[in-house]
């Protein structure tokens, strides 16, 4: 098993190009199952464990994939199986994304109930509700979702989501593009990753109106074509790198971004005392002195993203004053707090709100990763902690960050990856 060993006290400074987005890559890859023609070529796909897991799932389904230098090619003509087995799905909740495409293309899908990050309940009820609205008969038995399209093809419908859900919106969208008739998705997630999925489906020939809004109108079609497509940048990775510069009193330039996708995060960095500059595809953060305590509330886009909540909490341990961090998306996403407190932070939990008392001098020790973004928060804390911090179980981190230790090394961090055994 791998761990990251970090010697704190080095400033993060320099220039870097943002990686491709994991959270848009996964639904885009899933959407290739909607077409049985030709070979898809997808650029700017991050080299992550979740991408590897998805490729293994596609191999099981009968697709052919190849990955090199962040370009993924996929041929789906020979896909025959509609079974996504537990052995693969348990590794990653996003495997549920194959439900909509398989059901839309073949009229049947059998997908194991998903696994993934270990914080709080993240039910798939909204995914199943959307499939049922489109005419699927859903049964759950022996740990599998069995979905069958009545009459062999899904039918357009109006889907009103009671709460915004990126995953359910993506699944409904992919199912609807091959459904007979018109589908309206209300209270759709408007995250940039859903917008990117819409653009990909439109390139394939789908008729989608309302891209980038909370109401999507989809006119179903009979078939879709293979395309070449470039993925968007990873706004969460970019935000994490900005936080690394801010927590160490450094400065960083990130190229290949879309600043409008990060407005809420950039505003909070500014509120916290950092100087932020942007161009069409670049964001620059410069530290200006002591950080100021700044409250955040994690909510659906365009608000502050829940996937940056843990990193912001680490940052606020070094800010002057008391900050409140509330998560309205995942109320129990606070597994990182005990580990941050082990490093010397002073953070209290009050329901779905955390109160961070800063600034606190952090001291390096061994800490345990519990999920993807919690891991990132511990790395950030390690960058500023006195002495050596060991972040264990970094396989969580590898699910969402492409060689983060190398990228941080290139910006001045003293960080390395080592093997270890949990049994001695």
From Swiss-Prot:
GO cellular component assignments: cytoplasm
Pathway: Cell wall biogenesis; peptidoglycan biosynthesis
Active site: 117
Chief location bin: cytoplasm
PANTHER family attached to this UniProt entry: UDP-N-ACETYLGLUCOSAMINE 1-CARBOXYVINYLTRANSFERASE (PTHR43783:SF1)
Protein keywords: Cell cycle, Cell division, Cell shape, Cell wall biogenesis/degradation, Cytoplasm, Peptidoglycan synthesis, Pyruvate, Transferase
Annotated function: Cell wall formation. Adds enolpyruvyl to UDP-N-acetylglucosamine.
Binding residues for UDP-N-acetyl-alpha-D-glucosamine: 93, 122-126, 307, 329
Protein name: UDP-N-acetylglucosamine 1-carboxyvinyltransferase
InterPro entries: Enolpyruvate_Tfrase_dom, Enolpyruvate_Tfrase_sf, MurA_subfamily, RNA3'P_cycl/enolpyr_Trfase_a/b, UDP_GlcNAc_COvinyl_MurA
């Amino acid at each position: 098993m791998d761990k990251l060993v970090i010697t704190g006290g080095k400033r993060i400074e320099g220039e870097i190009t943002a990686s491709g987005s994991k959270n848009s890559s996964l639904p885009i890859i899933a959407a290739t199952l909607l077409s049985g023609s030709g070979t898809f070529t997808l650029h700017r796909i991050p080299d992550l464990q979740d991408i590897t897991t998805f490729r293994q799932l596609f191999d099981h389904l009968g697709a052919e994939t190849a990955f090199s230098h962040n370009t993924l090619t996929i041929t789906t003509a020979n896909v025959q199986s509609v079974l996504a087995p537990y052995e693969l799905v348990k590794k990653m909740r996003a495997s549920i994304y194959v439900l909509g495409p398989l059901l839309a293309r073949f009229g049947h899908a059998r997908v194991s109930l998903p696994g993934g990050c270990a914080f709080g309940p993240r039910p798939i009820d909204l995914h199943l509700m959307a499939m049922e609205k489109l005419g699927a008969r859903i049964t759950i038995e022996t740990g599998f979702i069995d979905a069958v399209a009545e009459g062999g093809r899904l039918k357009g419908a109006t889907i009103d989501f009671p709460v915004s859900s990126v995953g359910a919106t993506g699944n409904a969208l992919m199912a609807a593009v091959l459904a007979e008739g018109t589908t309206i998705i209300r209270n759709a997630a408007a995250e940039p990753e859903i917008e990117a999925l819409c653009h990909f489906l439109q390139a394939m020939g789908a008729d989608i109106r309302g891209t980038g809004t909370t109401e999507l109108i989809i006119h179903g079609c009979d078939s879709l074509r293979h395309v070449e497509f470039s993925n968007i940048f990873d706004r969460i990775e970019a935000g994490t790198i900005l936080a690394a510069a801010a927590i160490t009193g450094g400065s960083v330039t990130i190229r290949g971004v879309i600043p409008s996708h990060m407005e809420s995060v950039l505003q909070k960095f500014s509120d916290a005392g950092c100087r932020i500059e942007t161009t069409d595809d670049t964001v620059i953060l410069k530290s200006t002195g002591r950080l100021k305590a700044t409250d955040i509330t994690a909510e659906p886009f365009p608000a502050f993203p829940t996937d940056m909540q843990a990193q912001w909490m680490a940052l606020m341990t070094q800010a002057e004053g008391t900050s409140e961090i509330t998560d309205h998306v995942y109320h129990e996403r606070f597994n990182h707090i005990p580990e941050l407190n082990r490093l010397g932070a002073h953070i209290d939990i009050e329901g779905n709100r955390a109160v961070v008392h800063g600034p606190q001098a952090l001291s390096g020790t061994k800490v345990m990763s519990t999920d993807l973004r919690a891991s990132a928060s511990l790395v950030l804390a390690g960058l500023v902690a006195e002495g050596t911090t060991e972040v264990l179980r970094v396989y969580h981190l590898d699910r969402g960050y492409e060689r983060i230790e190398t990228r941080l090394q290139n910006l001045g961090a003293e960080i390395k990856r080592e093997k270890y055994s949990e049994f001695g």
